[in-house]
């Protein structure tokens, strides 16, 4: 089996088609935050990883993949209750928030980008991409969801963007052990091709990183 470290959001949105392009391979996936996926490489526990860091792990090659776009979203009812006057610092500090795991800093980064302040709202820890989305749809809290998963909900009105003009793009990278690179060349090609079809060109300057 090929052991990989991958973010949950990438797995839920675009990685599976890449794996399907190399049906001769079997996979053992370690799901982790993209900010820390490279630690699996440093420990020698995986052959490759989708990471959120442009710095190359020792003994690895790095390939930029593009960026996943995230949108701060909530249900219409939640918006009326907590954000009647928009996502102000006061409102964000009081509104329940979704967090994937303690490693997930995306919501905090978005709030600081939006308000200029470091806020600590009440939050739910919910380490599941689809539960994260369901929680937003059902009005439990707001959270940063991949645009690929929420675009239809935004069109239908089931979800509302807290600020439609303030998306966040999370750059992703494919890092692979040089020792394993020749044997995994078909997988690398599949990853790069699939990423090019699904991800956005990364922002010139971006430090926003998440579980995905």
Residue ranges of predicted features:
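Central regulatory/effector-binding core of bacterial HTH transcription factors
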Residues: 1-58, 212
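Short alpha-helical
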Residues: 9-13, 35-36, 57, 105-106, ...
